[in-house]
């Protein structure tokens, strides 16, 4: 039986978070403000029959289906919040689980770096696929497990403040988020991202 690591409902995908998703999305590309659900399970191959259930139960579009070394990931979305929730409910029924059975996030690192140096900005930009961080901007970095919570943190941070999505990694052993912008906006975004995870920790 698959173990439910992450079950993340997103009420509205924010534009920058959605665009970054497009850098590694191999399925149907989402649009801004769509509802979405991200599911992470172990072992990884168990995500395949769960995907079958989701796409056959209601009209949702799968954007990501990845089986990696240990875990499997599925993201699907729709203009209809009800359809996304119904597909999620069908998956939970198959697992004999509830959303509360998903693992709670654990924050491993959370740091703000003020006024990034030219060389530091260059090194970050060489390894990222999102917006470029500029010298003198502030940088927020966040690491958590399970990894899928990275998309929730990025999305909630973008709702709260005008920041750039430099990078987020939502698959693998840990998730990571890189955000940049003016220091005041970065601090607001950091609070929003941390609070989103804290709410899941307390659930």
Regions found by a protein language model. Give the residues of each.
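Intrinsically disordered, low-complexity polar/charged tails and linkers
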Residues: 1-41, 45-48, 57, 101-131, ...
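Solvent-exposed alpha-helices and their adjacent loops that cap or buttress functional pockets
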Residues: 28-32, 64-69, 131-134, 158-159, ...
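Short glycine-rich or small-residue beta-strand-to-loop segments that form or flank ligand, phosphate
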Residues: 33-42, 71-79, 137-143, 174-182
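Short amphipathic alpha-helix segments
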Residues: 44-59, 148-161
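Flexible, glycine/charged-enriched surface loops at secondary-structure junctions
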Residues: 60-68, 99-110, 163-171, 201-203
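Hydrophobic, ordered structural segments
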Residues: 74-110
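Charge-rich, low-aromatic oligomerization/scaffolding segments with amphipathic character
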Residues: 82-96, 185-200
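Surface-exposed interaction/gating patches
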Residues: 122-166, 182
């Amino acid at each position: 039986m698959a173990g439910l690591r992450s079950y993340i409902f997103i009420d509205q995908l924010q534009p920058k978070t959605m665009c970054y998703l497009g850098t590694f999305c191999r399925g149907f590309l989402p649009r801004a403000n769509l509802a979405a659900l991200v599911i992470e399970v172990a072992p990884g191959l168990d995500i395949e029959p769960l995907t079958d259930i989701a796409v056959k139960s209601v009209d949702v579009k799968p954007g990501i289906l990845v089986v990696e070394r240990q875990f499997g990931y599925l993201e699907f979305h729709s203009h209809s919040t009800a359809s996304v929730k119904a597909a999620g409910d069908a998956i939970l029924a198959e697992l004999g689980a509830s959303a509360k059975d998903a693992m709670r996030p654990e924050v491993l690192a959370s740091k703000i770096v003020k006024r990034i140096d030219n060389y530091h900005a260059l090194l970050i930009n060489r390894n990222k696929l999102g917006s470029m961080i500029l010298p003198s901007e502030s940088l927020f970095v966040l690491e958590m497990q399970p990894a899928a919570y990275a998309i929730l943190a990025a999305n909630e941070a973008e709702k709260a403040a005008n920041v750039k999505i430099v990078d987020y990694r939502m698959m693998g052993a840990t998730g990571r988020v890189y955000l940049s912008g003016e220091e005041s906006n970065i601090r607001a975004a950091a609070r929003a991202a941390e609070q989103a995870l804290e709410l899941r920790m307390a659930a």
